[in-house]
Amino acid sequence: MVLLNGKLKYIAVVAIFYNLIILLVKEKFPYICTKKKFHAISNRILYEYLNNFVSKDIFRREDITLKNLNFVQTNLKSDKDAEIKENRDTQSVDDNMFQRVYKFILNFFYGNKKNRINKSMNYGKYDNFNKINDIFEFMRNNGLPINITSVCLIDTGLNIKDALINYFLNHDISTYNSYTYHSVNINYKKPDSFNFGINSENCDEDNYSECESTFLENHNGHGKYEDKSTIQGDSLKLIEKKYDKNVDLQRSGIDVEICKAFNNSKEKKNSLNIIPVIKCLEYCKTKNVKIIHMDYNINEQNEQLIQIMDDLKNSEIFVILPSEKLFNEKPYEDNSVIYPSSFFEKFENVFFIGSLDYSDMSSDDADIASNFQIQKNEYLKYRKNNVFLLDSINSSLKKRDDHDILYYEIKYSSAFFINIITIILNIYPNMSIKELRNILSYSIPSKETAQLKTENIFEGNFDINKFIHILLNRGINSSGFVRKYKDVTPNESTNKIFLLEDQKDADIEPQKDSSIDIYCDEGGSDEDIVSTSNGLDVYSEYSHSNNKSDQLLNDEKGLKYETYKDLYSVKENDIYVFESNNPTNSSFMQMNYDDKIKSKYLDNLEEANYQNHRTQFEINRNDNRYPIISEDNLRDRQNMHNIQMLNDGINYSENANNIEELYDNDFEDYRGKDLNPEYNKIRDNNNNKNINKEFGILNTWRKNNEGLYLSDSEEESQPFKWMDMHVDDIYQDRKKRLKGNNYDNRNGRVRRIYEDNKRGRYIKNRNMQKKKNFDRNLKNKRYLNRRTKRHINEKNKRIMREKKNKYNNSVLKRNEMKSHNNSQKTPKIIPRKYSR
């Protein structure tokens, strides 16, 4: 600056000033100066801060009923790249003077840049569900939800005074512009009339068919908190993707049906009969919904109610009940007590969801009532610092001034559970209830307290982070399952039954003594492994000591002996052991029995998979005629023959991929028609006609040389020595036919001549092109006289002649060496492995 004159000083000062202004504005308002950058693969947005939760490989279920069948592979930036990006201000040495001045000023006024991290990356104690919403948003933006799930909500009606629900019904951005929600079948007509639900709160046995109405409004506005949380769920959000002036609105993944079954008044809502609930359940079933949520827990038995619950179970409809807000004919309710549902242990499609408000520090304990203790009013003490089944929503659902949401936050658990199931059903609409329970069982960690272990009605804590990890990362392997082990004495009582009102004492069903491993079947009963393995006694005399062959036989016979652990069948003293014999990256919803049964035959080249799954292979044919053959010897011999015959273009069969499949495809028939009459007597005449064409021409030759083969008695003791002779004979016969036609020599000579000519033409054309380019460049130089040009041309011609002679000599020498080697080559002799 000192060496510059006045005009240049003015220009330098102005340039520095404007550079600082631009840098500061760019940091403070980045959307003004630069376009927002994000990685996209086929319009699928990738969030870089979800590295720890989202797997790089997202698998789609390949099903013809789904719309998307492709495989999406996302390459997210690693955490190391993010750290480098954060520390770039101190580590970069390529910054110019203006950038260094800008960073100094920025750190001076705003502090260190490292402490300013994206808010979406800061997941604190009460931001757990914000993290989950980000993951769900990632799934939706990447095209994973490919279906729409219908949900029926049974409660006290809609609070249309609420700003969010009012916006949800009116679709008016000016009313509630902070949210962008949308539903397919909810159309708002007028405040007291809706066309997406019914009102059955006035139904009874007399007017059961004529009690429906369309008035769904909640008078006092204290109801439908679960519906509001469902609407707030990520599955209903509408994503706006702006491309220039066009706006692409993504369709939501849920349909909502409303049924008002409970009265708004707190004094009457618990004293009503069960008829409105039954009416709403029937209405939801007629709407072909997939999920039904009731705002109140039902702890009552009714024949008509049980019948409709059976219909819902047969229709594969999920029913979700909260743990609190007990509903029965008695005017009694205590929200501080967690009651079980009367359907929980009888219907596998019923999910009993509850949560404990561990954020409330005013009380340390919560009351939990079991089935046999409801009439006695005796409750167990359970500490609130342990989450029950599902995390409470806490303050993450609180929006602006909606303080009532924070007050009812412990009741959002069942509603938020709807969003979880909706996300799964949007991706896999054909998933069964049992498959979902198998998935959820992996998301329930072990019970932490002894008080909760004593109650068989409660399953344990539900870890939502573990569930999301299973959903997006690896999922449950198709071959992985949970085995159930028990160690219960006969004196211990584990299974408690539901008590009616007239019963005073509980009939305790004793548990059978079991000191061995037992499994749990579909109905939750225990089944002894030894008792189910009686049908496999035929193979017991050939089994090995390591019991791995027994496992193979169980897989071949079917999977009915290996039942899988369900969420509803959890009892006390259970130990969950995750076993995965085949840890492969597969979709977590592929839980069908057909997917778990691995194929008997594996590829020859997959040595690792073969050795991991089957260490021994048993061959039993024709009433156990052949003994058990060691797998290693069998595979080594087969690999040796495959390599020998593939080099000469000889294959066993078009459909035989390995030695086991080859042995099962009537391998004895390849020997010929009359070589072994005992085999032909057992087999049908049609099987003798299905001889492979590759070996059929050798029948006449083998008839004349029958003495070279083994006898029947020798073949029983050494069955595979005949196979070696068979392979050797095929090889020799094939060699003779190839030499007779002189195919090998003629084809090789023509191929070598063609390759030499092709390379010679290529080199000649390349040299000619170089010469032309060189001559053209020389002629363009005008400072050279005619004599100099002539000398240069003569020199070039001499060089080209030398190169040509050198190339011809090398080709001639190479041909002489080939002819010399061919003349000295001796015919290949393959020794016979067995001779008489």
Curated annotation (Swiss-Prot):
EC number: 3.4.21.62
Family assignment from sequence similarity: Belongs to the peptidase S8 family.
Name by which UniProt lists this protein: Subtilisin-like protease PIMMS2
Keywords of the record: Cell membrane, Hydrolase, Membrane, Protease, Serine protease
Phenotype of null mutants: Ookinetes fail to traverse the midgut epithelium resulting in a reduced number of oocysts in the gut epithelium of the mosquito host, A.gambiae or A.stephensi. Gametogenesis, and ookinete development and motility are normal. The capacity to infect the mouse host by the few sporozoites made in the mosquito host is not affected.
Role played: Probable serine protease which plays a role in ookinete traversal of the mosquito host midgut epithelium.
Gene3D superfamilies: Peptidase S8/S53 domain (3.40.50.200)
InterPro entries for the chain: Peptidase_S8/S53_dom_sf
One GO term (biological process): proteolysis
Listed PROSITE patterns: SUBTILASE_ASP (PS00136)
A molecular-function term among this protein's GO annotations: serine-type endopeptidase activity
